[in-house]
Design a protein with these regions (language model features):
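ABC family nucleotide-binding domain
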Residues: 1-151
Length: 151
């Protein structure tokens, strides 16, 4: 279960403090699908960054399976992110010098996964890109880049 309790996120700038999230409360149960929708500038990306352990709230509690994520250090949050979350960024965040296979293999290196090349190749096959395994991002269409991110 994922819980947010009275979560605020404030970005401090020289000109002003921007209150991106105010008193957010949210419960997401295991197996539940959730869609985050709102106007531009409403805090969707900020919320997703917190939920994905990429950022911490300014105040409030973020709990995953009753453990407070804010109490974790960067390495612990990275490990949690690698185990529990999958991301498809708006810009896909592919590294320009890596092939499709290397892109998918990269997070597996940090998780010490054995047979990571084979697992990465299987993931690319599942999204229909086995024939593009050695292609770099500039050789892939936008849709193909997105599928590499999904893999």
């Amino acid at each position: 279960m994922i819980q947010l309790k009275n979560v605020d996120k404030i970005y401090e700038t020289e000109a002003e403090n921007v209150h991106a999230l105010k008193s957010i409360n949210l419960n997401i149960n295991q197996g539940e699908f959730v869609s985050i929708m709102g106007q531009s500038g409403s805090g969707k990306t900020t919320l997703m960054n917190i939920l994905g352990c990429l950022d911490n709230p300014t105040s409030g509690d973020y709990l995953i399976q009753n453990s407070n994520v804010s109490d974790l250090n960067d390495d612990q949050r990275s490990a949690l992110r690698g185990l529990l979350f999958g991301f498809v960024f708006q810009s896909y965040n592919l590294l320009p010098r890596l092939t499709a296979l290397e892109q998918v293999e990269l997070p597996l290196i940090y998780q010490n996964v054995e047979d990571r090349k084979l697992k990465a190749a299987k993931a690319l096959d599942m999204v229909g890109l086995i024939d593009r395994i050695d292609f770099k991002p500039n050789q892939l269409s936008g849709g193909q880049q997105q599928r590499v991110s999904i893999a």
